[in-house]
């Protein structure tokens, strides 16, 4: 069988495309967590700017949902500039966001009646550019809409954070559907570590990196965001004792 003759024009075009894609990849800025164990699992060493990232609670309850919102707020807090937060449910507790490092003076809240309008406002804010981050709360994120948001983020270089919120159990199944997001996280509340004195320790979360472009999934046991939006690896997660207990109880 005769071998196909290479077309020099097509070969040159391929080389140019590969060169441009490589340059774009190298120029992509990231927002690191500042924790080597997490950053080394993320392409480029952090969450990519110019992309959208999804966050959801590990269950359908309000506690895990609040943890996901605070996790995203901590990410937004570590950016520079104004943060636009789009929502349809007026139940956001601003002091809690401040506790995660996102001061109210930095946030512009956009409240819409319908979820479709929330996502439209998110897209407009992403296209605007010059913002630290754009956050949107949504139950569903259709592929077509996620692509529009991703293209808007790519065009401006802004960080897009989508918090998936469920009102009922059946809605949580939508989180398994594919989207154009660069990463997908699931956050669950864990018991805080015992203190040597009576009291409640720093909140802890199980942060599951379910999906990441050009990377592998991973689980992290972290202590909740501090006043600067920074996480910290839990001490028993670092020495493996928590994973040991999980294995024993799940066996």
Task: Locate predicted features.
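Conserved beta-strand scaffold positions in the cores of enzyme catalytic domains, especially
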Residues: 52-54, 109, 184
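Generic structural hydrophobic/aromatic packing signal, biased to beta-strands
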Residues: 38, 55, 72, 122, ...
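Detector for small/aliphatic-rich hydrophobic stretches
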Residues: 1-85, 99, 104, 211-215, ...
């Amino acid at each position: 069988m005769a071998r196909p003759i290479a077309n020099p024009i097509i070969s040159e075009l391929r080389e140019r495309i590969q060169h441009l894609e490589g340059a774009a990849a190298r120029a992509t800025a990231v927002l690191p967590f500042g924790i080597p164990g997490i950053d080394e699992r993320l392409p480029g060493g952090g969450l990519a700017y110019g992309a959208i990232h999804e966050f959801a609670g590990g269950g359908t309850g309000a506690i895990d949902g609040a943890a996901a919102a605070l996790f995203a707020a901590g990410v937004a807090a570590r950016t520079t500039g104004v943060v636009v937060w789009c929502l349809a449910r007026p139940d956001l507790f601003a002091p809690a966001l401040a506790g995660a490092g996102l001061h109210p003076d930095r946030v512009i809240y956009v409240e819409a009646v319908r979820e479709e309008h929330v996502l439209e406002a998110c897209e407009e804010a992403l296209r605007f550019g010059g913002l630290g981050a754009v956050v949107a709360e949504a139950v569903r994120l259709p592929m077509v809409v996620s692509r529009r948001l991703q293209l808007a983020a790519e065009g401006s270089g802004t960080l897009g954070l989508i918090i998936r919120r469920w009102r009922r159990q059946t809605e949580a199944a939508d989180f398994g559907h594919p989207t154009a997001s660069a990463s997908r996280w699931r956050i669950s509340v864990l018991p805080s570590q015992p203190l040597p004195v009576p009291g409640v320790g720093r909140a802890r979360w199980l942060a599951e990196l379910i999906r990441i472009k050009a990377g592998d999934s991973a689980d992290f046991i972290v202590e909740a965001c501090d006043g600067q939006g920074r996480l910290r690896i839990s001490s028993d997660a670092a020495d493996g004792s928590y994973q040991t207990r999980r294995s024993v109880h799940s066996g």
